Every structure is written in C-alpha cells, then in structure tokens.
C-alpha cells in the first residue's frame, strides 16, 4: 500500500474512532488514568503522527500528573492560559460538561488544514500550533488531564509533551 493510501486509511480510522467515542464521557478522579481515558487522548494523536510518518507517542505518568496539577489550577476559572512550564502543551476548553478527550485532540489535529509545511507557517489569521505540537518529530512522551470547571464554566483539558516542540524556525517533522 502506498504511503498516501496508508495515510488516508489512518485518517479514516481516526474519524471512525472519534465518531464512536461517547460525547457524554466525563472522567472522575478514579478514572482519569483509566485505559479508555488515556486512549482517547493517545490514539488520535498517534494516528495524526503516523499520517506524517512519525513514531507514536508513549503515555507518561509524570506528564499526566503535571497535566492534572495544571488542570486543577484552571478548575475555578477555566481560562485558556498556558502553564508556562517546562513541557510542550496543548490546552482545550469546551462549554458545558459533555466533552471527551478525543474531541479535544480532534480540535488540535484539525488545525492541520491551516499548516503550510513548505512555508513552515500557519495560514494568515489561523492557528496551527496545537497541530504542530502533536506532530513534533522529537517529542516522544505525552500526558493529559481534564477537569470540569466550577460553576458550569465548561470543561478544560490539557496535554503536556516531552521533549517540547514548536521551536521557532524549525519544522515539526
């Protein structure tokens, strides 16, 4: 099978995965480390990486704990602010409580349409940095977390990446 066919097949697999994930899945403290929760973050990111010929990310508990710590910091305000920590980071906010990890990853990966590889830049007026972090070639580990914010302010999710990516002037892969 050619690389293009393989990439297209992986893309279809990602769409199938996302369409079958329940929109009502909200992890509690006990389940934030569950295999299903991890896989909802990990599998679609690894499909996006495979589509551009990269090795899969490995789930990392240290990054997961950092992500959970930071998500807990955002619980009261649900603000889309980065932690400014030592890792690469993607953040997501959705109104209400019906959001799942695969939807957050889908929002990040959907930015691919705004990334111009040849110019190594985003289309004017669009974001693509979440996508480029997902597919950053030297990144090997990821850990993610989610919280439902206070006073019905929404759902906040974050993934942290090590080594970090998105270095100015460098292509992701």
From Swiss-Prot:
Disulfide bonds join 78-149, 122-128, 144-159. The keyword Signal applies. InterPro entries: Allrgn_V5/Tpx1_CS (IPR018244), CAP_dom (IPR014044), CAP_sf (IPR035940), CRISP-related (IPR001283), V5_allergen-like (IPR002413). Keywords: Disulfide bond, Pathogenesis-related protein, Plant defense, Signal. PROSITE patterns: CRISP_1 (PS01009), CRISP_2 (PS01010). SMART domains: SCP. GO terms for biological process: defense response. CDD domains: CAP_PR-1 (cd05381). Pfam families: CAP (PF00188). GO terms for cellular component: extracellular region. Probably involved in the defense reaction of plants against pathogens. Residues 45-161 form the SCP domain. This is Pathogenesis-related protein PR-1. It comes from the Eukaryota. Residues 1-23 form the signal peptide. It comes from Medicago truncatula. Belongs to the CRISP family.
